[in-house]
Amino acid sequence: MTTDWAEIACEVPAEMVDTLADFLVELTGNGVGIDNLHLDTFSLDTLEDTPLKSVKGYLPLDDSLEEMRIRIEQFLAQTGPSFPGYVYAPPVVTVIRNEDWANNWKVHFKPVRIGRRLVIKPTWEEYLKQEGDLVIQIDPGMAFGTGAHPTTKMCLEALERIGFYAHGGKLPSPVLDVGTGSGVLSIAAALLGAEEIVAVDIDPEAVRVTVENLELNGMADRVAPSTTSLEQLPGGFQVVVANILAEELVRLAGELTARVAPGGWLILSGILTEKEAFVCAAFSSLELVENPKELEWSCLSFRKPL
């Protein structure tokens, strides 16, 4: 017997998106869709004047739906007023037939430009390449990032800056991508000139998706993806990038620092601004070079002394 699904869409201020998304993931056990946050426009700069975002959760169309809808309404009513610009609006429920479920999320993923030259496009979208563009083709699957989230975006921009400004236009090798997910950072590193990249993730499914995306981009010979633990990897990486939770960054601080070569770079993301000092304290042996922020997220770029 096939299962149809219900999409529950909630309109909230941009500042509330991550709070609501986390709640929906915990409540439903499924992924979420976010419209007009970073995926419905080619230029991220145009999003500042868009006050409301649509966050969509997904539930089986069964007897539990009404109870879940009420819990979502209660969460909105209780949590929403603490966010500037919030006005309560009841969630909108739409039925998604089983045959459409697997591909429904894809309509929200459009080509997006990040930094000066990087462009991320899904495999099913057409894109007219411009001079100088470095195009990443990606088929992330429902469980992995598209590259447009602020945490990933800031990592991509940091990689581009390090290569362009600090190393004459070419990202130095080797590069270590910790928590690779869909492999987008590793592919970007290769496009930016790195000749040797190691990509690790504790999730075998992430490694499988990364392998597929490497093949899509012709990078399979330059990136080595695996579930190898940090402890098993050698040191000497010129660039280490880790886009994972702040608590995990702190727990792995010693291992991450040890993987960076003298004079090398460590890019950390996945950090809520309120936890920035907590993370910085764990990496106090390194020099903090830059600290960009977007929405409630912070990215830290360190350099290891020679």
Curated annotation (Swiss-Prot):
One Pfam family matching this protein: PrmA
Single biological process term from Gene Ontology: methylation
Class of the enzyme per the UniProt entry, highest EC level: transferase
SUPFAM superfamilies for the chain: S-adenosyl-L-methionine-dependent methyltransferases
Subcellular location: Cytoplasm
Residues holding S-adenosyl-L-methionine: 152, 179, 201, 243
Keyword Membrane annotated: no
Keywords for the protein's UniProt record, in alphabetical order: Cytoplasm, Methyltransferase, S-adenosyl-L-methionine, Transferase
InterPro entries, alphabetized: Ribosomal_L11_MeTrfase_PrmA, Ribosomal_PrmA_MeTrfase, SAM-dependent_MTases_sf
Molecular function in Gene Ontology: protein-lysine N-methyltransferase activity
Catalyses which reaction(s): L-lysyl-[protein] + 3 S-adenosyl-L-methionine = N(6),N(6),N(6)-trimethyl-L-lysyl-[protein] + 3 S-adenosyl-L-homocysteine + 3 H(+)
EC number of this enzyme: 2.1.1.-
GO cellular component, one term: cytoplasm
NCBIfam families xref list: prmA
Function according to Swiss-Prot or TrEMBL: Methylates ribosomal protein L11.
PANTHER family linked to this entry: ELECTRON TRANSFER FLAVOPROTEIN BETA SUBUNIT LYSINE METHYLTRANSFERASE
UniProt similarity note: Belongs to the methyltransferase superfamily. PrmA family.
Name of the protein in its database record: Ribosomal protein L11 methyltransferase
Species lineage: Bacteria, Pseudomonadati, Thermodesulfobacteriota, Desulfuromonadia, Geobacterales
